[in-house]
Amino acid sequence: FGVKVGKNAAMDPSAAGDIYSLSVGELDIESTITSGSTQGEAPGIYAKSVKRDLTANAITVKGYTNATGIHLTEGGRNLTISDMQVSAGISGNAAGIIAAPGRDNPVSTAGKLENIRIDNLEVSGGADATGIFANSITKSGQSENIIGNITVSSENGLATGIFADNADINLGGRILSSSARFNAYGIWTEN
């Protein structure tokens, strides 16, 4: 873990705690563990939610298996990320931001992201690769959800830039999704 807020060392949604305000300069996480309960998983930031704000200049996460840049089990607000790079191992799933208890949750049960700004997000996985996963991406007041560039690539699974039921965003750059063997989607949303 780079930053973990919770009652124990496990990635347990029921024990996760809230981030009220967090500012990160550079966060660099790499897992090389090949066995154990998490089997080489690398989460950059893990918490229940962000209540006030989270800012980061650079987040780099490399997992021996799965890798996640920011995992918020219930969602969060006012996230500002300048640059985030996430890469997973040959059979691992990779995600930039997850707003859900787990990566396998249906999007209908995921949490909400509100007022986010991401300048550059790069995600690559051996299996599935996802830039942002949330039930909804919404804005409040005069704030806007501004997405710069998202690049997502997968060797052996789905590649999805943004996966959400509802998304209210301004795309300032481009979303590039590619998969060597399966489907690739820029934005996958129900509404």
What are these regions (language model features)?
Residues 1-67, 71-191:
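Surface-exposed loop/turn motifs in large extracellular/passenger domains
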